[in-house]
């Protein structure tokens, strides 16, 4: 839908604003596996394992994610001092936190056999982003802030849907917190972080070179042009997600 809405973005956002938004979303995608310890991968793997208690998976994955988010929040003054994402740093942190949890719960849904829920969640989030973009950009004319708010609210909509349709938070139990199981999950997930980071570097690092040499506005133009090849990447991700489940099950 981001491809379909490109005319909307280019009309209501300046190239500089769109460049800033693109840098925020790109950096969030890099930070998710680092902040969460790549735990969503472990959630899928252990949730698919019939010999593992899913409640333990939910509980310990949530604790790991919360620790990562809290540590990131503690770094807020330091990040603010560097003027990274000046004036939109708080939105960046909120978007990061919500995406960490939506990703974890979505992977739990897949591992729990709720593939339809996983698929519908993607569609609901996409629809929410589209409608909220139109509301905040066209109706309220809030520009950059409106775009970021729409992304955060779309993540909240996704979280609400996943909370209603999966037993994730119902399965959470403080009694099941286990350091040994958290270590086991992290032992599986942490080695996947370099892979995620390197794929991110291949696909997204060019934006930072453009930012450094040409500025934010040039990155906005690049981000718009990049929507076309992103469609091919999206099609590839469908097969990749199906392969992940088959790999664990077999």
Q: Which positions does each model-derived feature cover?
A:
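Transmembrane helix-bundle signature of multi-pass secondary active exporters and lipid flippases
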Residues: 25-33, 199, 222-241
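Helix-loop junctions and terminal segments of transmembrane helices
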Residues: 35-51, 229-250
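Membrane-embedded alpha-helical segments of multi-pass transporters/permeases
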Residues: 3, 7, 34-37, 73-81, ...
């Amino acid at each position: 839908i981001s491809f379909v809405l490109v005319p909307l973005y280019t009309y209501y956002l300046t190239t500089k604003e769109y460049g800033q938004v693109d840098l925020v979303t790109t950096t969030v995608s890099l930070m998710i596996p680092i902040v969460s310890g790549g735990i969503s991968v472990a959630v899928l793997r252990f949730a698919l394992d019939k010999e593992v208690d899913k409640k333990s998976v939910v509980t310990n994955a949530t604790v790991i994610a919360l620790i990562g988010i809290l540590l990131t929040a503690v770094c807020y003054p330091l990040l603010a001092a560097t003027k990274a994402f000046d004036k939109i740093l708080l939105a960046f942190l909120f978007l990061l936190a919500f995406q960490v949890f939506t990703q974890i719960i979505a992977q739990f849904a897949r591992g729990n056999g709720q593939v339809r829920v996983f698929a519908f969640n993607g569609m609901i989030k996409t629809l929410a982003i589209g409608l909220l973009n139109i509301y905040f950009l066209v109706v309220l004319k809030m520009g950059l802030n409106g775009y970021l708010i729409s992304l955060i609210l779309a993540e909240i909509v996704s979280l609400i849907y996943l909370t209603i349709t999966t037993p994730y938070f119902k399965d959470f139990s403080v009694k099941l917190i286990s350091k040994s199981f958290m270590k086991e999950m992290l032992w599986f997930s942490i080695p996947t972080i370099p892979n995620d980071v390197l794929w991110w570097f291949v696909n997204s690092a060019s934006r930072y070179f453009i930012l450094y040499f040409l500025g934010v506005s040039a990155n906005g133009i690049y981000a718009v042009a990049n929507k076309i090849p992103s469609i091919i990447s999206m099609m590839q991700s469908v097969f990749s997600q199906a392969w992940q489940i088959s790999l664990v099950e077999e």
